[in-house]
Amino acid sequence: MASWRMLCFVLLFTSILICHDARPLPSSLSSSNGSPAFVESVKQVVKEIMRRKQLLGTQYSTNRLSPSGPDPHHH
């Protein structure tokens, strides 16, 4: 019974230490919504990435041929 109490005490004590050891986030980072300017710039970047992907996707093709069988010198 004493070992059970000691185990509970150790677990409780370590959980208290862990909770007090953590650093709280600044209020600007803890808010769920970002600033409107940041969100707008992210939207513009994503649009530009999608536009470039579409441009490259229509022109890009691989000319590489895969080998027809195992390399005889490999094994």
UniProtKB/Swiss-Prot annotation:
InterPro entries according to UniProt: CLE1-4 (IPR039616)
Any one GO cellular component localisation term in the record: extracellular region
MF-aspect GO terms: receptor serine/threonine kinase binding
Keywords assigned by UniProt, alphabetized: Glycoprotein, Hydroxylation, Secreted, Signal
Presence of keyword Signal: yes
Residues listed as glycosylation sites in the UniProt record: P70
Residues annotated with Hydroxyproline modification: P67, P70
Domain of life: Eukaryota
UniProt signal peptide: 1-22
Coiled coil region boundaries: none
Entry keyword annotation includes Signal: yes
Family label: Belongs to the CLV3/ESR signal peptide family.
Remarks, miscellaneous: Roots of plants overexpressing CLE33 exhibit normal growth, but reduced levels of colonization by arbuscular mycorrhizal (AM) fungi.
Record-given protein name: CLAVATA3/ESR (CLE)-related protein 33
Species, as recorded: Medicago truncatula (Barrel medic)
Name of the gene: CLE33
